[in-house]
Amino acid sequence: KEHKESVLIIKTAWGGKSLHTDFRSPSAGPYQFNDKQLAQFQKQGKDVDKIKVDKVAATGHYYRLMMAHVKQVLADVKRVYPNYNESRGYELAGFVWFQGWNDMVDRGTYPQRDKPQGYAQYTECMSHFIRDVRRDLSAPDLPFVIGVMGVGGPIEDTKKRAVHVNFRAAMAAPADLAEFHGNVVAVPTSPYWDTKLDEIAGRINKVRNMQRMLRTKNKNHANKDGSMTRKQQRAYIDDYRKTVVDEQDAATFQRGASNAGYHYLGCAKTMAQIGYAFADALVKMRR
C-alpha cells in the first residue's frame, strides 16, 4: 500500500541465540564473564581457560553470518528477485530486530535480572548492534525497529513479573537515546499475545503434567503404588482430559497454536499482527 516498488525482505533467523554472545557486534567488545560465573565454573571443576577460549570463538559468530548473508543477497539481487532492475538499484528501507528469550532467561550473564537495570548489558549490546549494522551496511540513518519481546502478554503480578518488566525495558531503552531519536523505534509485541490460546495451553499442560505424575508414580497421584498398566494410565488420562479441556477448546488450540509459548505459541494471528506493527513503524519513520 505504501510503495509502488517491490519490497525484498532479507531474513536471517537462527533459534536459541543470544545478543550477549551469538549476535554480539564488534563495537560491544569481548564478552566478559562476571565473578559469579567464574566462581561457579571453578566450583563445578570446569576448565575455565577452555570456556574462555570457546566463548571468544562463539562471540559475534551469528552477527558475522547475518552480515555476510545480507551482503551476499545485495550483491546479486537478481538471484532471488529476477525482475530486479539493476539500473535503478535498491534502497535499504529498514531493519527489524526481534529476539530476546535466550538473554532474558540467562541468569549467568544477568545475575541481577530481577533488579532495576539488571539487564543494562542488553541495552548496551543493542545500542552497539544498531551502530554496527548501520556502519557495516553503509546506512548511517537506517530506520531500525526493536521488537520488544512480548511472550506472556500483558505482565501480571507473578513471581516472574520483575524479570519480564526489566527485560522489556532494557530492550526498548536504546530508542530513547538522543542519537537514535526519530530513526529507532521500540515496538511492543505483548498486545498481540493470544490470551485465549495461552489459557488453553495452561490446561493442556495440566494434562501433560498428570501423564508425568502417573508415569513416575508420584506419591500424590493415582498411580502412587505403580499398579496401573500403560493402558490404564491412558484411559485415566483420556477421562481426565475431558474434565480439563473440552472438544471446542481442543479444536481451537489445534487450529491456532503450533509451538511453545516462547515462540508465541506458533500462532499465525499473533505473528501477522506483530509483522504489521513492525512494518507500520518503519513506514511512519520514513514519512
Residue positions per predicted region:
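Cell-envelope and extracellular/periplasmic
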Residues: 1-287
